[in-house]
Amino acid sequence: MKWLSKSWAVAVVLLVGCAGRQEFIPPQPNAEEYAPPKLDYTLPDAQSGSLYRHQYTMTLFQDRRAYRVGDVLTVVLSEETSSSKKAGTKFGKSSAVNFAAPTIGTKKFDELGVSIDGSRNFDGSASSSQGNKLQGAITVTVHDVLPNGVLRISGEKWLRLNQGDEFIRLTGIVRVDDITRNNQVSSQRIADARITYAGRGALADSNAAGWLTQFFNSPWVPF
């Protein structure tokens, strides 16, 4: 009977560990939402008797910044955030109730006198801080030009290292006015930005918590 109860305890631990575990699916390169837009890159036929093609001409003083679907744009990553928070709570309460000893006639019953005292105190505090910093560059592609003229950009960069891969993915909306003459834009000037920097492989796996650690960190553990 004892071994049966132990078996049930082990089974419960395993089931709870599986319930609290979050499966991580490694990302794959060439995701459709980050791939360059599918365009027809073939040159249109020139007009009869002319070598001029209107859509593929460039004047001497033309702006070389990205502004069309399919153009490339370099995003300079300059992200740094920090946050801190502190909270404290403290309160106390005390009360006292006294019942005087009753007197009957001329006799006083001191043993029947009652005195009740009570006090309660609570003191709690908490603090947290977090900081992130990301610097680098990634060249993305213009996927769409919205009716108001802003550009919807998207792209990814993969780096194959010794023990795994690292990748940067970025999507967002950029104003043409924020693009410099060098066809660059700061990541701080991107609206609705989605920036992902992560990795996969041996190094990424070594930083992942095992199933037993995830069990003790899950909400199912009452301690």
Curated annotation (Swiss-Prot):
Q: Where is the lipid attached (S-diacylglycerol cysteine)?
A: C18
Q: Name one GO molecular function term.
A: cytoskeletal motor activity
Q: PANTHER family under this entry? A: FLAGELLAR L-RING PROTEIN (PTHR34933:SF1)
- Lipid moiety (N-palmitoyl cysteine) attached at C18
User: What is this entry's stated membrane topology?
Assistant: Lipid-anchor
According to its record, what are the GO cellular component terms? Answer: bacterial-type flagellum basal body, distal rod, L ring; cell outer membrane
Question: Family assignment?
Answer: Belongs to the FlgH family.
Presence of keyword Membrane: yes
Compartment(s) where it occurs, according to its Swiss-Prot or TrEMBL record: Cell outer membrane; Bacterial flagellum basal body
Tell me which Gene Ontology terms the entry assigns under biological process.
bacterial-type flagellum-dependent cell motility
**Free-text function comment from the UniProt entry:** Assembles around the rod to form the L-ring and probably protects the motor/basal body from shearing forces during rotation.
Q: Which key words are in the record? A: Bacterial flagellum, Cell outer membrane, Lipoprotein, Membrane, Palmitate, Signal
Q: What is this protein called?
A: Flagellar L-ring protein 2
Signal peptide positions are: 1-17
- What InterPro entries does this protein map onto? Flag_Lring
The UniProt subunit note reads as follows: The basal body constitutes a major portion of the flagellar organelle and consists of four rings (L,P,S, and M) mounted on a central rod.
